[in-house]
Amino acid sequence: MTLDRDDNPAVPATASPWRFCVAPMLDWTDRHYRFLARQLSRHARLYTEMVTTGALLHGDVERHLRFEPAEHPVALQLGGSDPQALAEAARIGAEWGYDEINLNVGCPSDRVQNGAFGACLMAQPELVAECIGAMRAAVDVPVTVKSRIGIDHQETFDEFREFVDIVAEKGGAEVFIVHSRKAWLKGLSPKQNRDVPPLRPEFATRLKQERPDLTVVLNGGLTEIEAMHAALDQVDGVMVGRAAYQNVGLLAEVDRALFGDPRRVDRLAALQAYRDYVAAEIGRGTRLPTLIKPILTLFQGKPGARAYRRHLSEQAPKRADDPRVIDEAIEQLRWR
């Protein structure tokens, strides 16, 4: 798959739609974060937090799926293991306008395991293939897989390759987002599973070498633009997780560095656009402490960033319906 971006010739003609992605992250990649991210990068592919099939089929659909048109391209990540439930949830997501439906085969948490989905599905590639096949039959948008490189006893590339082959050949999956760590389902917390298992990016790069017909996206340990650029010589795309919220300003560098876009991103202008969004959201009943979370690290490393962050953190809980808190925080930035 290649990008069709006639309106923006700066994007390489052969660039994958997955060239740069922001990972789905629980408690982080909500619609507020994604709106800010889009002010910083026109080209990043954005993902929702994981939404379970039960939440969509039996819960508040609007709360889980609402998003702003500016967020495109945006993907919905689903958690589940029942093919028909996933197909119906995918259909709902596509009807809401999502550009992609992604299946979570990587989350190692006990709660997710108890629901029989996430990383534990790597032990059942035939079921994953059935799920992907059902989802693909239900929607016209791409259906993708995000997985680890293995679980527990699975150590070798051949085991990982077997999983991919089954899901690709029997399920029709064409896009694999590879978190280049294995997951220990017992004995490690989700946080430990993000750090303790060693990174094995060679699994993703070798997969691309051996299966050039697939779109392969590397996820895990990518924190610097230079490393992302180097990885793109070997895979179709990169996906960034924690670095995208620990230093959200990193996204302001992506379009120039990875897409050749000559436009310089003004972080202050991005914040002003987000401030207008905040005012509208407060009018709908959203509280300021929720809305400031994405912008706390926007100016990391800049003079006054600490005072800016402190003002937001201290004042937002006290004045939860006052967007002027953001204006006052901007005044703390000495480099303006």
List where the protein language model places each region:
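Flavin-dependent oxidoreductase catalytic cores
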Residues: 1-336
